[in-house]
């Protein structure tokens, strides 16, 4: 029997090509037009998106991107590229490509590169530790849609998530412990996950449970009393209720409860990006300090840390034999 030619497709959400209103508008238009992300009827949503949201939000969001943009580009893309490079170096016998669900480098090009190299078994690795219909399932949809254009399809191994994987929890633990060594133990350790509308969970998305699974596993490994480790949700958008407790409201309330020193980690983000570097590290830090807090430390995403690359390699190798 002919041996399969293996390939790995790493996928993250995406980013604008530049911190400009025009580039941000293109990116947001693609992102917010995905029915997995916003499931409102297109007849209602698209006029609102194109007529109101994009013209108003694009300049505002562009300024936020400018505040975190790196010399090499968008933080999310920079760190994702580093992850791709590090994983490829671990597995030189297997081609590894990076594609973004929205923006560049795009998924069609990444898949085309892999298939052009003769890949017959494709491992799809969405860089989302906790499954959600709005992220992981959107990757599944996109890959299936792209492959409709090919006559010869590869077999596919899809990594749904890795919320409780021992190597993932170990990497998070190392990050937290490093922060404790640098800054001392805080009054509270906050685990902030990206939120989703409550309605999505009520319709069957198990994302909240997967966030709780990660939090429970991490609590068991951290040298803090369980009651000093909190789980919250950030980045809500729109008017409908999202998962609670909200990160910003929680941080605002903590100083009045005698909590003066917090450290915050975002376990659901595999790479630092606008939501971690600007929303959390800057905006939410100011919220906490303005409310009377005294010390706030943001614990960076796993990015291209060795422990994170160990995890990604183990995930891929586990699925190569499936």
Curated annotation (Swiss-Prot):
Xref: PROSITE patterns: FERROCHELATASE
Pathway: Porphyrin-containing compound metabolism; protoheme biosynthesis; protoheme from protoporphyrin-IX: step 1/1
Catalytic activity from the UniProt record: heme b + 2 H(+) = protoporphyrin IX + Fe(2+)
UniProt KW keywords: Cytoplasm, Heme biosynthesis, Iron, Lyase, Metal-binding, Porphyrin biosynthesis
UniProt KW Cell division keyword: no
GO cellular component, as recorded: cytoplasm
Keyword Cytoplasm on entry: yes
Gene3D superfamilies: 3.40.50.1400
Subcellular location: Cytoplasm
List of residues binding Fe cation: 194, 275
Enzyme type, top EC level: lyase
NCBIfam families reported in the protein's UniProt record: hemH
Family named by the database record: Belongs to the ferrochelatase family.
Function as written in the Swiss-Prot or TrEMBL entry: Catalyzes the ferrous insertion into protoporphyrin IX.
Name of the protein in question: Ferrochelatase
Organism: Yersinia enterocolitica serotype O:8 / biotype 1B (strain NCTC 13174 / 8081)
Gene from which this protein is expressed: hemH
